Structure formats: C-alpha cells, structure tokens
C-alpha cells in the first residue's frame, strides 16, 4: 500500500469510528493527486550567510534556526508554483530593493498556470521598491503584490481567475489575494460534482449560507429555480458578484449577512436594510433545500434550528468533529442519504466531508 493510499485509509477509518452510532451510508471517497495538488503556498524567506531561501518550520516549534526546513521545492504545491520558486528567488537576489528585509512570500496559482505572488516585507515599500518589483513582474510574466505593515501595493492585479469544470460546463472564478479559496482545485471540482449530484431532482429554490466567492453557488444554480446566498465578508461578496456576472448566471442573489443575521431575518426577529436595498424579499422564495459550508466551528445552535426546518440539507464540512456534533441534532428530523470524504489535504489530519440529509417522513 502506498503512503498516499495508507493515509487515505486512515482517514476513512477515522470517519467510521467518529460517526459510529449514527445511521450513515457507506462513505464515498474522492481521492487527490498525491503531489502538486495545492494551488496556494506560503513560505518564510530565510536570510543566512549572504544567501536567502524559502523556509518552513517544524510544526509546533518556534520559528528559528533549530526548527528550520529549507524548501527549494515543495511537492505539495502546483507545478506552476514549483517552476516559479527558483526563478523568483534568483531574480530577487540580484536586487537590493527586493532582497532587503523580504520576510515572506505567498503564491496563488490556477490549474491553467496563472500566478499571483505576494511579497511581504519588514520595511516601508517606496518608489525604488516599486520600480524593482515592476521589472521582476515583467521578467517573470506574473502579477506581484507588495505588502508591509499598513501597505498593500498592487502592481497589476490582486486576483487570479480559476476555471473549474463541472459536468459539461466550465465556471470562471475570480480568486482574490487574501480571500478564502479551496486550495486543492482537483478535489474542489470533485466536490462541486458531488454537490450537484446531491442536488439533482430536488427542484424549488436554494438557500446557501457561508457562500464565500460563490464556489458552490454557481454550479448549484443550474439545479434550482432561484438561489439566495449569504456571506458576511465584503471581499468574498464582491468576488461572488463578479463570478455571477462573468458566468452569465441570472438566478442568484447575494445577501451580505452572517448566518446568525440571516437566521434573525428569516425568523422575523430583525429587519435588515441590506436585504431591502438588494431587492431581496424572503417571502418570494420557496426553499426546498439549504446548502451550508460552515467554518471549522460548525453551525451555531440558532442557525442549526433554522437548517433543520428545510426538507433537504447539503452540508459540506471542514471539521468532522463539529459535523458529528451538528448531525447529532439534525438526525432527530432528517436521514443521512449520502456521505462523502474529499481528500482536500493529503498527508495531513484535515478531512473535508459532505452529507446529504432529507427530512424524515412521519
């Protein structure tokens, strides 16, 4: 058994143990490539003896020489990131402006090889730095952002555009520097396919909480009459609106509300001008399904009460422990019809999963 297969088996075993006692069907398993799967990568820049190189540190240890791991290559990162890593450090090393007090770097890439590089400094970035960075950007044919305390200098653009294939259609996504995106694009496509399969035939309208940049929203919109999606981050809402327009989708509306705020609006406890200003009347919708992709903490108690009111629930989770806790409540009213493991993060303990629940027929 390969190292990859073994770690995936360990995750399956963990889920079976964690969800023991719940009536959960056989877990569908979606594998990742075993290398070059991460579209994002972050490194410290380590300066030593006149040389500088990419570095990480041993987990759980203080960053320093004793825990230092030199990273000339990083097999988990996309091939585009690995190609650019030696070129970037070689060019930057030739410029005092780029080299001096360069502290860290973040790479954001796409399946097509588009790249955004954020160079983080412990100094104020001035015109001389900008000139050197523009020359580097042109030489490497990439987009560069400079960051320092209180500074963000965008030389060309602060996003990449990813294209993900779901079924027979390509969806374009603007991914903003610093915004949340699924790091494993190959597995993300499998997650989108699974979610669309889970939604097949449900009909009616869809409510989505925690929609981010519209990652799931866009392909799911093809399975429902109308979609109302909520997200609290202004950056993510802006990206989602661009993504909706860029893909020519006309049945999605975005409300900039947290899950807790939407629960208050839906139950009539509070009125929000943001809904009215967006031309959103909750009474216009006939929701058959709710889609949730919450943060690691899972769904809060009040929102969970709201979720349990829907006939169909599609729940994507980045934390199986909080999913288990939420399911302990949801199985009082619903049955788990499908369950899936998505190996978004190979060779780590992190597990991404998804479940489809349908209301019990009493």
From Swiss-Prot:
GO terms for biological process: tRNA methylation. It catalyses: uridine(54) in tRNA + S-adenosyl-L-methionine = 5-methyluridine(54) in tRNA + S-adenosyl-L-homocysteine + H(+); uridine(341) in tmRNA + S-adenosyl-L-methionine = 5-methyluridine(341) in tmRNA + S-adenosyl-L-homocysteine + H(+). It is an enzyme of class 2 (transferase). S-adenosyl-L-methionine binds at residues 182, 210, 215, 231, 293. One of its GO terms (molecular function) is tRNA (uracil(54)-C5)-methyltransferase activity, S-adenosyl methionine-dependent. One of its GO terms (cellular component) is cytosol. The keyword Transferase applies. Its EC number is 2.1.1.-, 2.1.1.35. Keywords: Methyltransferase, S-adenosyl-L-methionine, Transferase, tRNA processing. Pfam families: tRNA_U5-meth_tr (PF05958). The active site is at residues 318, 352. This is tRNA/tmRNA (uracil-C(5))-methyltransferase.
């Amino acid at each position: 058994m390969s190292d990859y297969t073994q770690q995936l088996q360990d995750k399956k075993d963990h889920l079976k143990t964690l969800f023991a006692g719940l009536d959960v069907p056989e877990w569908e398993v979606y594998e990742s490539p075993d290398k070059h799967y991460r579209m994002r990568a972050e490194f410290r820049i380590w300066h030593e003896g006149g040389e500088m190189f990419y570095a990480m540190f041993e987990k759980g240890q203080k960053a320093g020489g004793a825990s230092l791991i030199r990273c000339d290559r990083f097999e988990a990162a996309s091939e585009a990131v690995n190609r650019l890593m030696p070129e970037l450090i070689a060019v930057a090393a030739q410029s005092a402006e780029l080299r001096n007090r360069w502290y860290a770097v973040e790479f954001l890439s796409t399946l097509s090889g588009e790249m955004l590089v954020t160079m983080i400094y412990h100094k104020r970035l001035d015109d001389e730095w900008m000139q050197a960075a523009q020359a580097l950007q042109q030489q490497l044919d990439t987009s560069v952002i400079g960051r320092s305390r209180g500074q963000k200098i965008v030389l060309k653009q602060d996003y990449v555009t990813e294209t993900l294939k779901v079924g027979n259609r390509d969806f374009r996504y603007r991914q903003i520097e610093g915004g949340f995106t699924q790091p494993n694009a190959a597995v993300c496509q499998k997650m989108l396919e699974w979610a669309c399969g889970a939604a097949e035939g449900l009909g009616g309208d869809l409510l989505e909480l925690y929609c981010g940049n519209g990652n799931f929203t866009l392909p799911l919109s093809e399975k429902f009459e109308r979609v109302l999606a909520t997200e609290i981050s202004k950056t993510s809402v802006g990206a989602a609106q661009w993504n909706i327009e860029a893909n020519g989708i006309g049945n999605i509306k975005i409300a900039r509300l947290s899950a807790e705020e939407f629960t208050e609006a839906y139950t009539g406890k509070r009125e929000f001008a943001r809904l009215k200003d967006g031309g959103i009347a909750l009474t216009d919708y006939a929701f058959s399904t709710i889609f949730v992709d919450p943060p690691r903490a899972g769904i809060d108690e009040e929102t969970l009460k709201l979720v349990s009111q829907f006939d169909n629930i599609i729940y994507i989770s980045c934390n199986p422990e909080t999913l288990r806790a939420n399911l302990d409540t949801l199985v009082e009213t619903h049955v788990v019809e499908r369950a899936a493991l998505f190996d978004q993060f190979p060779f780590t303990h992190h597990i991404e999963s998804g479940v489809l629940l349908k209301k019990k027929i009493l």
